[in-house]
Amino acid sequence: MSTDLSVTVIILNWNGKELTIECLESLEKVNYSNFNILVVDNGSTDRSVDALKEKFPEVSILALERNLGFSGGNNRGFDSLKPGPPEFVIFLNNDTIVDENFIEPLVKQLLTNKHVSQTVPKIYYENDPKLIWYAGGIVNLWAGSIYHLGIRQYDGPEYSKTHKTKYATGCCFCMRYDEFKEFGGFDETFPMYSEDVDLSLWVRAAGKQVWFVPDSKIWHKVSASLGGAFSYGKMVRKARGLFLLIKKHANPIQWVTIIICSPFLLLVNIIKYFRLRYFGS
């Protein structure tokens, strides 16, 4: 039974105790029999650690002295699991609410095929529970673009099939402990954004696969931990992460096509930004 296999859920917190409390409350309802939770506090100054220890005394907390970013914080959490590590790890954003059945389908898909290295749930917007945020990921190094399949579309049969995909979003994914260690964890030159794509590109380059598993479901309060979906800070971090990704993975010919495509993509993204911010669609 897949529910007998040990799983640790790693959650990163930075000055987001209310979000983390709601996430942990949803995890309390999960019906998987053999899982633990590790909260990594990334140098919070809002007394998150005290609040979480008081409300969830059974949850392990790793308190870091300073903010090491998404990659660094998650890597320190992962490193703290030894000795006696779990068989699987799930990295989960603190601004999420999980379905009670979300763990088993992710583990089960990893067990069906030794070539599967990452599994990802179907992710909805929390404020519109049937509106999809992630149903697979696309990476196009020829155009320098990354996007989610199904984003801002209402759920339907076309988003209910298990399938291979290009990358696992860092919002939530599951891997074997040994494989995450083998791939070296998240690259800490990516403080936030595109580190998840970078990891999946290495996974696929090694001949492994990334699978979207719609039987696993979670809901995402998109960018709540960063002050909103349209914050200036988020846009800057995303642009920097994408540049680092292209610098690391694109070949010389792809650099040429990216430069050609960039003005068009910039215009599309500006239009999309204003449309979503001011018209909501």
Region annotations inferred by a language model:
Residues 15, 27, 42-47, 68:
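Conserved short acidic donor-positioning loop in nucleotide-sugar-dependent glycosyltransferases
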Residues 25-34:
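Short, acidic, metal-binding catalytic loop of nucleotide-sugar glycosyltransferases
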Residues 49-84:
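Conserved donor nucleotide-binding strand/loop of the catalytic core
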Residues 87, 96-134, 139-141:
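Conserved donor NDP-sugar-binding/catalytic core segment of glycosyltransferases
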Residues 139-166:
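Short, flexible, basic/aromatic active-site loop/helix in glycosyltransferases
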Residues 166-217:
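A short, conserved alpha-helix in the catalytic core of glycosyltransferases
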Residues 231-281:
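Non-catalytic, C-terminal membrane-associated alpha-helical segments of glycosyltransferases
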